[in-house]
């Protein structure tokens, strides 16, 4: 595992970050990439769509999965082709990738930073105890 400062430097230098997970409860790794300003290409599964706003902070790759709990694609070749297509789309348009990265950084800060989480938690507690 890389030290945090090295990982941050790599993600900050990256134009695009790819997360081809077939199972991801939330996808902290995507938030880390977004916080560093990288456009994210991730699988539309689990919690990834709650982090990556398709067409705003990056792109989501569609996936049809077996219903056995493994996350295995029904058609692995189709999933790989879709992943390659979306990745090519993002990396072929550096201006759009930068826009995704900037929007992702803003979303990570505004919605997922510790300050944002604390504000949301305080507001919820205030509402529940009012």
Annotate the PLM regions:
Residues 15, 37:
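A short alpha->beta transition loop at the rim of the catalytic pocket in nucleotide-sugar-dependent
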Residues 9-14:
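Short alpha-helical donor nucleotide-sugar binding micro-motif in glycosyltransferases
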Residues 27-30, 48:
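Short glycine/serine-rich donor-binding loops of glycosyltransferases
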Residues 55-77, 89:
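A short acidic/histidine/glycine-rich donor-binding loop in glycosyltransferase catalytic cores
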Residues 82, 89, 96-111:
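A short, well-ordered alpha-helix in the C-terminal region of glycosyltransferases
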Residues 89, 110, 114-130:
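C-terminal alpha-helical cap of glycosyltransferases
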